[in-house]
Amino acid sequence: MTVSLQNVTRSVDGIPTIRDVSLTLERGTLSVLLGPTLSGKTSIMRLLAGLDKPATGRVLVDGKDVTGIDVRKRSVAMVYQQFINYPSLTVYENIASPLRVQGKSREEIEKRVQEAARLLKLEPFLKRTPLQLSGGQQQRTAIARALVKGADLVLLDEPLANLDYKLREELRTELPRIFEASGAIFVYATTEPSEALLLGGDTVCMWEGQVLQVGSTPKVYRHPETMRVAQVFSDPPLNIVGIQKHSGSVQYAGGISAPASGLYAGLADGAYRVGFRAHQLEVANGIEGHHAFSATVTVTEITGSESFVHLNRDSSNWVAVLQGIHEYPPGHVLDAALDPNNVFVFDAADRLVAAPIAFSSEVRSGSREENASKKPSAM
């Protein structure tokens, strides 16, 4: 089965929410819609489901135009942020509800509910009602109900957003196994780059109703075609600094000059913008082959395992991530270093012209993105 969007557009109250989007989804694949709030992720899902109609363009299933076909006539299931279950029914009955609507036999219902319960680790809770479950168990019930339906297209709209951190991390690690066990097309919406990396599959990078880049998740992460894609796929935010390349040297905004080594050596003379993620900025002095800076601490966020140090240099705001607990008072001046082989370089049109030479050197041990990308299916 193949589901396609062809040049679809949509507006709400005169405001464009989808701008000329084309997208093809194949059976047995996972596509992660990654973008900030209001980037168009939910709008894309509603078009795929048949809940909304595009103003222009078509929705195709195996080449057949289904743009005007009602959602009830489509093989689609959807899981939302909210825990949408029937409160008066047990977990068993919640999972079984779409099968009863389909008129399945008692034996078939029993078989499929038990299979879904095993897959979602809900077997001990089948006799409970949703109010007797944790948030994670409630969302597992909703996912089980979507899977047991046997839909060809399963849409998950930020399904973990309303869970606490521990439950969210637990389900994140289980979802790839659940997806792999099904032959459906899965579309998963998230605002979090780390979630996209953990899930693997393909990433559809979105911004203001447009699809900016589509590709395997590691490829989009390592080789963003534009600065905007790099920004969407960076958490903490992408650090950016302007440079001027001339002959054998580069001058950073703020007046620091350095040899045009590493990736800079192959650039034509001119102006560029350099992007680097938080784990690419070293808080250290005198690292051989690195370009040295000094920057002023504005705030330090301590998460327990990591410290995010916010820095200001010549009106540029940067973030560095350090392992462990580091407390720097506001106003403290730190030495920082940047590896010229380990940056993204963008031209005047913000198109990528150079990426880190080796991904293995791009991500440091313990960083958010590295931990996520260690999942085998994301490599």
Where do the model's predicted regions map?
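Conserved coupling/switch loops of ABC nucleotide-binding domains, chiefly the family-specific signature
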Residues: 55-58, 208
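Helix-to-loop junction immediately C-terminal to a conserved catalytic motif
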Residues: 49
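The feature captures the beta-strand-to-loop junction immediately N-terminal to the Walker
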Residues: 34-36
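ABC ATPase nucleotide-binding domain helices that frame the ATP-binding cleft
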Residues: 42-45, 141
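Conserved ABC transporter NBD signature motif
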Residues: 57-65
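ABC ATPase nucleotide-binding domains
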Residues: 75-77, 81, 85-228
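Non-catalytic connector elements of ABC transporters
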Residues: 249-357
